[in-house]
Amino acid sequence: DNDYKEYAMYTIENRAIPCYLDGLKNVGRKILYVMLNDFKNKKSKVAEIGGSLSSKNYHHGESSAMGAVITLAADYNNNVPLLTQHGAFGTRLIPEAAAPRYIFASLNEKFYDYFQDFDVLEYDKDPDNGPEPLTYLPNIPWVLVNGIKGIAVGFACNYLPHSPKDIAKLCLKYTNKENIDNDILVPEFPEFSGKIITEEHNKFKTQGIINRISRNTWEISEVPVGYTREKYFEILTKLMKYSINILHFPKLNN
């Protein structure tokens, strides 16, 4: 029915699927607006930033807002975080952040290197939709920098993160009318030190790092992208239980 259709389109356009122009969901745009106008040169508590979003027509709860602030600021989640983290925001292996009242965020000092042309931004004329612009204008395809994920009714997206330097080089080649058809943009994952293997059809595989310490001891110092420490412990536990000769593994490092 029409109500369901309207809800589906609202979810797609305003919540779940990021905009390809700036790589941001609506809440990310609201956070940047708040940081640029209310906390421009200020390190502020994540709880305070999340709370201020409610005055900018964000209607999905402070907990959701604070989670979005952490996502934009966490180093392990971004090649170029739009916010700078101050405090325990988690790591790739242990992604849990400290309580929002104990951690702080500020606008990344590199923000203006990538986002410009603020004088030509367009704004929604509907006062119920908030004061933030319809989209920000990055000078490289930001949708490729930090990667984006989103799932909604009938739609989904999943872009891998890449090095901004690699993206800029390809953009320059393209604007100089050079052929880039055979250039492969290899992903770059924050806080990942393992291997990225290029396969056919623009597919990629990540590989962790394991080293032999002694005859019966191996050290895993990196796990593939997409695994937290707990997920990898579950795999080792199953291997130890069913077939592989794993006698013991300590839960030591992050």
State each model region's role.
Residues 1-203:
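Catalytic phosphate-handling regions of large nucleic-acid enzymes and associated NTPases
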Residues 177-188, 197-254:
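Charged, surface-exposed alpha-helical interface/stalk elements
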